[in-house]
């Protein structure tokens, strides 16, 4: 674990790494911050305050022994808001408590799923980020106790045949992590004001798709290689541009993300 960074008048000089029993110092002129949801904490080691925040994104895995969902379907996404399917009796119970009444309200779009595993697998992976308020990252992530039930009901609204599993799906496996994002949902890639320091982060909801190109762009910055014409679009210094600040007024943290 990086516990400290040595910075002199010429920029980065060393990195301190803490192990379970001891600590070592590595002499270096380059330091890349690619700490995912801990981008802010890592930046603070060199006095940087990155304009990022984190959203908690979860997923569930459950079995489909009845074969409601064909194994060869692609990733499927529901793009309309919806209300969760409940029986009249369930509605009455939920309506009777301030703690559960929100489950009767309209939920945002975005529930999606795909089959997981090879031949013989019955596993379905499903995701729905219906709560996108910023959160401080903790490990392990803590999910809403009702998350799995809500996702399954959202899928039943999308695929009515899945309603056979409501209340009968056993205990779905819940996992997930954080989306680190900037205000306009555009990554940070490039050099920092501290000489020798670089950042690659805030890849948000398209990290898998953008990671290869992001890594190549970062490598060009670090090695001093030729940069593509779009490189300035990802620099931290973009926030110093008055015209860019005006653009931010019409963008939000879901830009470019399903």
Regions found by a protein language model. Name each.
Residues 1-13:
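A conserved short coil-to-beta-strand element within the FAD-binding core of flavoproteins
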Residues 14-19, 202:
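Short beta-strand segments that buttress and anchor functional surface loops
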Residues 20-30:
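Core beta-strand elements of the Rossmann-like FAD/NAD(P) dinucleotide-binding domain
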Residues 33-48:
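Flavin (primarily FAD) binding-site architecture
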Residues 65-195:
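Active-site lid/adjacent beta-loop-alpha segment flanking the redox-cofactor pocket in flavoenzymes
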Residues 192-258:
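C-terminal lid/capping helical subdomain adjacent to the catalytic/cofactor pocket in oxidative enzymes
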């Amino acid at each position: 674990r990086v516990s400290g960074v040595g910075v002199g008048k010429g920029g980065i000089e060393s990195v301190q790494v803490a192990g379970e029993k001891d600590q070592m110092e590595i002499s270096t002129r380059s330091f890349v911050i690619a700490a995912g949801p801990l981008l802010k904490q890592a930046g603070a080691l060199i006095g940087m305050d990155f304009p990022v925040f984190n959203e908690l994104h979860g997923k569930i895995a459950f079995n489909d022994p009845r074969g409601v969902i064909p194994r060869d379907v692609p990733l499927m996404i529901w793009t309309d808001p919806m209300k969760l399917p409940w029986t009249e009796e369930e509605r009455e119970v939920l309506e009777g408590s301030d703690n559960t009444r929100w489950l009767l309200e309209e939920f945002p779009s975005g529930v999606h799923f795909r089959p997981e595993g090879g031949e013989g697998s019955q596993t379905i992976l499903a995701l729905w980020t219906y709560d996108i308020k910023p959160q401080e990252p903790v490990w392990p992530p803590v999910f809403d106790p009702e998350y799995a039930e809500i996702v399954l009901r959202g899928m039943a609204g999308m695929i009515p045949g899945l309603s056979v599993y409501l209340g009968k799906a056993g205990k779905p496996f819940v996992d997930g992590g954080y989306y680190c994002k900037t205000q306009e949902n555009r990554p940070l890639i490039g050099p920092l004001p501290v000489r020798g320091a670089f950042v690659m982060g805030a890849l948000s909801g398209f990290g898998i798709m953008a990671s290869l190109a992001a890594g190549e762009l970062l490598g060009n910055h670090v090695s001093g290689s030729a940069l593509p014409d779009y490189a300035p679009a990802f620099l931290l210094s973009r926030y110093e541009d008055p015209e860019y600040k005006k653009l931010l007024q019409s963008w939000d943290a879901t830009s470019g993300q399903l």
